[in-house]
Regions:
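Glycine-rich phosphate-binding loops of nucleotide-dependent enzymes
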Residues: 2-253
Length: 253
């Protein structure tokens, strides 16, 4: 029986306050299986806070977060990851003094239940090595396999981090501003790479750059002052007058 289109991630009347200041104010949103869902909003909209609520960095003040129908509100990040949610960070989160292949190997080993140890010939684990090779090819990093992760270009580092997140074979992948700090060419490269490596997968992309979301995603939600202002197909959201006024500006009208 096909599971396409069923809810993978659900936010139900989600609230988050710090002290007496409300940041997230009643967000309800659904990400469905196979969907590429983009979340955009101006600076200060609450995007990072919402992202951290979903990934377990923060516990909600009120409301619920469901992953495949089970509540993950307030669950530690490592347990959320085990349940099938993987994320990349706005700032690269790699092992800079290890090679590209070693970074991927650690991610693959963790997914298959192996521990990284100096006393075990992990490179000889055929399944792990095969998966590492597959990811290197998908990420277009075969020629960089033995280079230190810290020596990669910034766009290559982001590609590697996304690959490490995908190596856990998640139910849903969360990307936090994957093109932040990139030139136009680097951004185009990373967007195309994300499109290729996440084909058929469920994706939630948090972005400030609306062009990235409109180019990559098939569903878009707009967060303004901690509330969902609009949600739907990218072309519908782009044409929404409220969105133009709140986020895109009159020049987008």
């Amino acid at each position: 029986m096909s599971r396409a289109g069923e809810p993978v991630l659900e936010l139900r009347d989600l609230h988050k306050s710090f002290a007496e200041t409300p940041i997230i104010r009643g967000v309800t949103m659904v990400v469905r299986r196979g969907q590429r869902h983009g979340l955009i909003g101006p600076n200060g909209a609450g995007k990072s806070t919402l992202f951290n609520l979903i990934s377990g960095q923060f516990a909600p003040t009120f409301g619920d977060i469901l992953l495949n129908g089970q509540s993950i509100a307030g669950v530690p990040p490592y347990l959320i990851n085990r349940r099938g949610l993987s994320r990349s960070f706005q700032i690269t989160n790699l092992f800079p003094r290890m090679s590209v292949a070693e970074n991927l190997r650690i991610a693959v080993m963790g997914h298959h239940g192996h521990r990284f140890t100096l006393f075990r010939p992990v490179a000889n684990l055929r399944r792990v090595s095969s998966r590492v090779d597959e990811h290197l090819e998908k990420l277009r990093l075969q020629h960089r396999r033995n280079d230190m992760a810290g020596d990669l270009a910034y766009s290559e580092q982001r590609a590697l981090e996304i690959g490490m997140a995908l190596a856990t074979d998640p139910e849903i992948l969360l990307l936090d501003e994957p093109t932040s700090g990139m030139s136009r060419d680097e951004s185009a490269y990373v967007v195309e790479l994300i499109r290729e490596v996440t084909e058929g997968k469920t994706l939630l992309v948090v972005e400030h750059d609306m062009s990235v979301v409109f180019d990559l995603c098939d569903h878009t939600s707009v967060l303004v002052y901690g509330q969902i202002l609009a949600s739907g197909a990218p072309e519908t959201v782009r044409a929404d007058r409220r969105v133009q006024e709140a986020y895109l500006g009159e020049e987008a009208a």
